[in-house]
């Protein structure tokens, strides 16, 4: 039997490719997709793809949930603060015409605390909840090989697995509702530490050899050196865009990455890891916060930090980070990294969350 879904975030880079991957008569189909109405060529293509899939495009949550003719709601949206707002608006509407026990499949990257609080809140509302974060970027979503980090109810995973295998590469990490979020943040530790390593090397190469950061010689150098023991995928998927093509506004965008770094720092702290694990995440979060402040209104991806790491710019980055990092007080450093963010990004972090946060 085909699973009937409605979706929030269907115009985004990670969920929109599902419109073409899920075929008629398959394991699942989307009945309706919520559209915030942002106009550009990419989203227009997404709208057409969803229409070709057979989904109706709707502009409010009330129409999205309709008369309760769906099995589950798929949400692939923002961070804790963004998605908490969605849940507050959505759940009362789901309750109004609830025909059975629906589920929410939450694909966003949120903190482990969010996943637990959402589960506790929705369980009391008679709604099943699972958080399956995605990793692999827009290309992974487009090619249906992104990793889907699943956990929580085994019966829900078994029901969804054929659908998940159609849009990506799922792996189930057990019955803990927070395991998917935790695994995603483990991956982000690898991403951000790899990013700092390759950016440090690129900045040092520029200074030692007295060369520009970008250019064909730099690209050839790191194509070679990245084949050694220090190789990282952050060369291929991130900084090579800047070094090879002088492109700094495409990739993992800083306003999203900074929140993930804070979530990773918080999780490491909660699980008792040493400052050696936590402080680098705070430092990279502050580096991203510095970019957001220095280049306010200019879209920049994470690898743009390398431009602040060369000698002529390094003092500005140092001055900013040393204001906020306290190596002897990890908790204060995490709080300071949040306080340093622009307000709109700060609101999305929402580290302090419990089940009462979702009450409208």
Regions found by a protein language model. Give the residues of each.
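Rossmann-fold dinucleotide-binding core
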Residues: 8-9, 109-192
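NAD(P)-dependent dehydrogenase/reductase Rossmann-like domain
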Residues: 268, 285-360
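Rossmann-like NAD(P)-binding element
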Residues: 13, 55-113, 142, 146-149
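NAD(P)+-binding Rossmann beta1-loop-alpha1 motif at the extreme N-terminus of oxidoreductases
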Residues: 1-74, 138, 171-172, 203, ...
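Anion (oxyanion) recognition and catalysis
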Residues: 23, 51, 123, 164-165, ...
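Helical "substrate-binding/catalytic lid" subdomain
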Residues: 178-309
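Hydrophobic beta-strand scaffold residues
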Residues: 57, 128-130, 275
């Amino acid at each position: 039997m085909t699973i009937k879904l409605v979706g929030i975030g269907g115009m985004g880079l990670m969920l929109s490719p599902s419109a073409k991957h899920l075929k008629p008569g398959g394991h699942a189909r989307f009945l309706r997709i919520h559209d915030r109405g942002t106009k550009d060529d990419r989203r227009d293509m997404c709208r057409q793809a969803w229409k070709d899939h057979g989904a109706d495009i709707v502009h409010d949550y009330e129409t999205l949930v309709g008369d309760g003719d769906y099995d589950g709601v798929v949400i692939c949206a923002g961070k804790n603060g963004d998605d908490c707002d969605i849940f507050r608006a959505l759940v009362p509407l789901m309750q109004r015409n609830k025909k059975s026990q629906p589920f929410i499949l939450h694909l966003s990257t949120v903190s482990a605390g969010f996943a637990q609080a959402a589960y506790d809140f929705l369980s009391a509302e008679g709604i099943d909840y699972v958080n399956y974060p995605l990793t692999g970027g827009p290309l992974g979503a487009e090619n249906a090989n992104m990793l889907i980090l699943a956990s929580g109810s085994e019966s829900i995973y078994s029901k969804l697995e054929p659908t998940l295998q159609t849009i990506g590469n799922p792996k189930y990490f057990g019955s803990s509702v927070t395991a998917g979020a935790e695994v995603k943040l483990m991956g982000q530790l690898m991403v951000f530490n790899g990013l700092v390593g390759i950016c440090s090397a690129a900045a040092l190469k520029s200074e030692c050899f007295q060369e520009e950061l970008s250019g064909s010689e730099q690209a050839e150098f790191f194509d070679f050196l990245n084949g050694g023991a220090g190789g990282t995928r952050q060369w291929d998927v991130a900084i090579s865009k800047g070094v090879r093509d002088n492109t700094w506004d495409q990739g993992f965008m800083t306003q999203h990455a900074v929140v993930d770094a804070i979530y990773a720092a918080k999780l490491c702290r909660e699980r008792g890891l040493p400052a050696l694990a936590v402080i680098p995440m705070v430092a990279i979060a502050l580096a991203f916060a510095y970019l957001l402040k220095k280049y306010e209104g200019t879209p920049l991806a994470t690898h743009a930090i390398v431009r602040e790491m060369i000698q002529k710019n390094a003092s500005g980055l140092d001055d900013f980070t040393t204001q906020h990092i306290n190596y002897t007080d990890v908790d204060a450093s995490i709080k300071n990294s949040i306080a340093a963010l622009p307000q709109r990004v700060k609101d999305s972090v929402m580290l302090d969350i419990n089940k009462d946060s979702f009450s409208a």
